[in-house]
Amino acid sequence: MKKRFYMFPIILLMMAIFTACDPDNNQEFPGNGTVTGSYEVKSDIQFPMSLFLTGIPEEYAAFKEPLASMVAMRESALAQELGKAEINLGFRKITYLYPSCGVKGDSITLSAVAFWLGYFDNGVWNDLKPENICLMEHYTITSDAETPSNAFALEMFITGNTLTIMPDYIGYGITKEKPHPYLNHDICAINSIDALTYGYDLFNDSSKYGMSPEWKLYLAGASQGAGNAVAVHKYLDTHPDLATKWNFASTNCSSGPYSPVVTIDKYLADGKVAYPVVFPLVMKTMFDSDPDIMKSFTEEMAYSQNYLAVKDEIDRMIAGKEHNTAAINQLFIEKVRKTVDANLADGEIYLTDILSPAMLDKESPICKALYQCLEKNDLTKGWTPVHPMKLHYSSQDMVVPQENSLAILEAFGEDIVTLEHASFPADHTTTCSLWMVDLFSKGF
């Protein structure tokens, strides 16, 4: 299917801009996941592109008519190519459960989605043959409603004619009652490899036509998803037989926390942060994932009195999975931020309003313990990439500092790493949106 049939989502993307278990590798191709078992389909839906158009918010109502016209033109062109009188372009989305392993090495069932393109011909769904596979890692969320299995992922529009696999991660979807291991790159990589394994099996069992014979695997993601994509890249390149079996080609991502150490270093050096929810997310992960390191401390020891006054409320918001990151960050501004001056932007908060003096002291025992946990998840160390990666970033990103991308380049060199700076001064969200446009328009 030719790329011209996907050009209409570019407007949607521009709207977005401006508004640890030990793997045994015992399975045969196509997977080599970390555990054995089988998938379970929870839902299998096919829906036309026009269904998405009906969900455009009222403030963007003016876009509906031109978008509908563009969809109609693409469908007409595809119908002509297929020799059909009329078709309706759409997606097939299958939500499934699959076995993997939890933070403590226990067996766990996780959820993910697999989706690919197709069309309706006289109301009958027809799959199209995907040209490649994309393992797409989703960005940071705190609301279960945002998970790939529960939402209409914008990433569906940017991966072209691919079989795209999107895992929910531990703590979302079927496991929403569990804490999410934020920035635990190793476990997220293993869970993603398992999602890929069983998603591919599911596709082979469900699709009429199968994959194109020369398919490749591409990894992608933005923000937290970028870190997880590079973590999967590490897993594949340190398991070369697995990389070969999966026809691994490259990684393309944006604005990822590849080095949690560098990220926290930058926050501490600046003395302020524009994404305060990162601190409870990180601290909860470290206490849950590394109890041996953090056993001498409590979460309360990490925080200021300002934060402790609302800690229970923030904990409930994170655990309940009903509030997005914007809502939680706003609570920080409203109830935790006490110090305001000319050097602080509207959405920023000084670390002294969030963290205890001990946590702000890199020589203190609790801060050293935190850094020990962060070091375990630093993707700039402990491996040598084989396959190329393209990383988008911005010097104006105050959420995930550019130092992360620069650290990857310094660690692995220009032969492996291509850096793509935002084409104009862009914050975190805009940089990720520009990445979507670039990936959509240029491909992997």
Predicted feature residues:
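Alpha/beta-hydrolase active-site loop
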Residues: 182-206
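Short beta-strand/loop motif that positions the catalytic acidic residue
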Residues: 385, 390-397
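Primarily recognizes the serine-hydrolase "nucleophile elbow" in alpha/beta-hydrolase
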Residues: 198-274
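C-terminal catalytic histidine-bearing segment of alpha/beta-hydrolase fold enzymes
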Residues: 265, 366, 371-373, 396-407, ...
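C-terminal motif of bacterial Sec signal peptides marking the signal peptidase cleavage site
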Residues: 16-20
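Accessory cap/linker subdomain of secreted extracellular hydrolases
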Residues: 254-382
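Catalytic-loop region of hydrolases
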Residues: 24-121
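Short, surface-exposed "cap/lid" segments of acyl-processing enzymes
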Residues: 104-111, 115-160, 172-176
